[in-house]
């Protein structure tokens, strides 16, 4: 009897344990598999393949005509949904020229820009340099002077944490002469900039610089890691007349030829239709060229139209970029 009683008690204990285990499994929330974190993956799949920066030229009328302080650039760009800043040197020339571009004036420019970008959590991307001399002039002495005029901007870019300066290749209109002069001017400047960890970028910006195959040839001959292109979606007019552009390079061919050398990209825009598409430029087609080249850096919005206000044009360009970029994912 004693042995039977013990066996009976043992069976009861086992049954109770099994019942409690079943109840605890039923009530306890199921542990999610570790690889279920798909929302993040899904979110990334719907994000564009690039980051958004704002070219300050998009607000040049605000600064020059409406009296907007250029040092509010970071604040405005932040409010418009950008994360990167592309400064335009010419919008600060009033104060800098008055001080003859002294070291103190340049240091003040850098300090103010850094303070504002830090305050608003923005990234300084590059500085677009204009009016500092012709880097592609056939006159060696003038070319050297132009190169040296850019040194202070290389220094400023380095102090601001930018990765590059954008330069122009103004100068000769004779193809062979322009190529040779461009190679020399860029090599001199890129050599100086290399020690500062700054890239020297050439934008297709009129004249022979808008002849993409020639600009690509210049890049190949310079052959320096810190010298490249900044393809602009719209600046492919080689020669102008009183009626407009007399000779324009094929936009899509040009972007395709410049992208292998691209270290930055500029999204030019002029006007938009009712659906928000750019009326001259096929953004989906252009962005596919950019993506196929493996580019994943900043794309800078540069609105240059006259129908919309600058703020409206900036936002319209931003929205079109995001829309077209997402569609390529």
Question: What are these regions, as identified by a protein language model?
Answer:
Residues 110-231, 311:
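Active-site acidic/histidine proton-transfer and metal-coordination neighborhood
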Residues 64-77, 144-155, 247-255, 283-286:
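Short, acidic/polar
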Residues 26-42:
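Short, low-complexity, disordered segments immediately C-terminal to signal peptides
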Residues 47-49, 183-288:
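Acidic/histidine-rich catalytic cores of soluble enzymes
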Residues 69-91, 160-161:
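Catalytic domains of carbohydrate-active enzymes, especially glycoside hydrolases
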Residues 50-56, 85-87, 124-129, 165-167, ...:
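Hydrophobic faces of well-ordered beta-strands that scaffold small-molecule active sites
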Residues 86-113, 170-174:
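Glycine-rich, proline-tolerant flexible connector loops at the mouths of alpha/beta enzymes
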């Amino acid at each position: 009897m004693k042995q039977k009683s013990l066996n009976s008690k043992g069976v009861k204990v086992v049954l109770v344990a099994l019942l409690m285990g079943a109840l605890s499994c039923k009530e306890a929330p199921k542990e999610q598999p570790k690889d279920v974190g798909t929302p993040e993956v899904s979110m990334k799949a719907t994000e564009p393949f690039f980051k958004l920066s704002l070219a300050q030229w998009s607000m040049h009328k605000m600064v020059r005509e409406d009296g907007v302080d250029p040092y509010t650039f970071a604040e405005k760009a932040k409010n418009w949904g950008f994360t990167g800043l592309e400064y335009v040197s010419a919008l600060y020339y009033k104060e800098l020229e008055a001080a003859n571009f002294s070291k103190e004036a340049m240091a003040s420019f850098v300090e103010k820009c850094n303070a504002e970008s830090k305050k608003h959590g923005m990234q300084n991307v590059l500085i677009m340099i204009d009016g500092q001399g012709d880097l592609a002039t056939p006159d060696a002495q003038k070319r050297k002077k132009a190169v040296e005029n850019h040194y202070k901007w290389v220094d400023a870019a380095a102090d601001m944490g930018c990765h590059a300066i954008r330069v122009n290749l103004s100068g000769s209109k004779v193809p062979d002469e322009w190529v040779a002069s461009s190679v020399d001017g860029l090599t001199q400047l890129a050599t100086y900039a290399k020690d500062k960890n700054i890239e020297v970028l050439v934008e297709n910006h009129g004249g022979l610089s808008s002849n993409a195959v020639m600009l690509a040839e210049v890049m190949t001959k310079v052959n320096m890691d810190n010298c490249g292109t900044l393809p602009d979606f719209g600046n492919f007019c080689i020669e102008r007349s009183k009626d407009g552009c007399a000779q324009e390079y094929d936009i899509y061919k040009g972007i395709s030829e410049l992208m292998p050398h691209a270290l930055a990209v500029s999204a030019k825009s002029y006007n938009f239709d009712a659906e928000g598409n750019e009326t001259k430029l096929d953004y989906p087609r252009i962005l596919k060229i950019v993506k196929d080249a493996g580019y994943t850096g900043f794309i800078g919005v540069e609105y240059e139209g006259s129908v919309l206000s600058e703020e409206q044009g900036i936002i319209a360009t931003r929205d079109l970029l995001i829309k077209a970029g997402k569609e390529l994912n």
